[in-house]
C-alpha cells in the first residue's frame, strides 16, 4: 500500500479514491484519463503522480485497496455458517451496500477490473485479482445448491439472480434520488420473489 498517501486527511484520500474509481470504472484502464481524474478530484496532476508515480501505479493501488476494502466488509457481514443461498446473497449485498455508502463506484470498478484486457494493467493486478476471485468464490461455495435440484437448474437460477442484481444496480444508480439503502431494499424484494419462484419450501 502507499504510506505517503495515507498520511493525507481522510476526506482528501476519499476524494482522490472516488474520482479514480469513477473514471477507471467507465471504460477500463486504456480509456481512463488522469486529466479527468484530477479534475474530478479537484487536485493537480503533480500531486497525483507524487503519490502514485504513474497511471499504472494508481491503478494497481486502487485495485489492491478496493479488493481489501470489499473483502473486509464481506467478512463482517457474511456468516460463515450460512448455507441458505438467498440469505447468503442478501448478506453479500448488504456488505456491498455498506461499501457503496463510502465508495459509490468501488464495486463497478472491481467488476470492470477483473475483466480488464490491457496487458500492463492485467499484469499489475494479477496476483491480487486471483486472491480476490478465490475469496469471492469461497463465499459462494458456502451455499447449499441442492435445494434447487428438484425444481430448477441451479446454474440458471444463480445467473438469473446475478442478472437481476446487476440490472437493478444499473437502473437505480442513474436515478436522481438514488441511495444504497433503496437499492438494497429493492434487491431483497426481488430475491424474495425469486426464492418463491425457484424453491418449494417445506
Label each residue range with its predicted role.
Residues 1-8, 202:
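N-terminal intrinsically disordered/low-complexity leader segments
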Residues 12-20, 37, 62-66, 70-73:
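Generic hydrophobic, amphipathic alpha-helix propensity
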Residues 15, 23-57, 61:
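Helix-turn-helix
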Residues 26-30, 81, 103:
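Short coil/turn segments at alpha/beta junctions that flank glycine-rich nucleotide-binding fingerprints
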Residues 30-31, 148-152:
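Short, charged helix-capping/linker segments at alpha-helix termini
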Residues 68-79, 83, 98, 119-147, ...:
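Amphipathic alpha-helical packing segments from all-alpha helical-bundle domains
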Residues 86-112, 137, 162, 196, ...:
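Helical hydrophobic small-molecule/effector-binding pocket
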Residues 100-121, 170-174:
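Amphipathic alpha-helical segments used for helix-helix packing
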Amino acid at each position: 500500500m502507499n504510506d505517503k498517501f495515507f498520511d493525507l486527511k481522510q476526506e482528501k484520500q476519499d476524494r482522490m479514491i472516488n474520482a479514480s474509481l469513477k473514471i477507471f470504472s467507465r471504460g477500463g484502464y486504456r480509456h481512463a484519463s488522469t486529466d479527468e481524474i484530477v479534475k474530478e478530484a479537484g487536485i493537480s496532476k503533480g500531486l497525483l503522480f507524487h503519490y502514485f508515480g504513474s497511471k499504472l501505479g494508481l491503478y494497481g493501488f486502487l485495485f489492491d485497496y478496493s479488493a481489501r476494502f470489499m473483502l473486509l466488509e464481506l467478512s463482517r457481514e457474511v456468516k460463515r455458517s450460512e448455507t441458505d443461498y438467498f440469505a447468503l446473497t442478501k448478506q453479500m449485498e448488504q456488505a456491498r451496500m455498506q461499501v457503496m455508502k463510502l465508495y459509490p463506484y468501488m464495486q463497478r470498478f472491481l467488476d470492470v477490473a477483473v475483466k480488464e484486457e490491457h496487458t500492463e494493467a492485467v499484469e499489475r493486478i494479477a496476483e491480487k485479482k486471483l486472491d480476490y476471485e478465490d475469496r469471492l468464490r469461497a463465499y459462494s461455495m458456502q451455499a447449499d445448491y441442492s435445494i434447487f435440484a428438484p425444481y430448477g437448474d441451479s446454474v440458471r437460477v444463480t445467473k438469473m439472480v446475478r442478472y437481476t442484481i446487476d440490472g437493478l444496480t444499473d437502473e437505480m444508480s442513474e436515478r436522481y434520488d438514488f441511495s444504497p439503502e433503496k437499492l438494497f431494499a429493492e434487491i431483497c424484494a426481488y430475491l424474495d420473489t425469486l426464492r418463491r419462484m425457484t424453491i418449494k419450501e417445506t
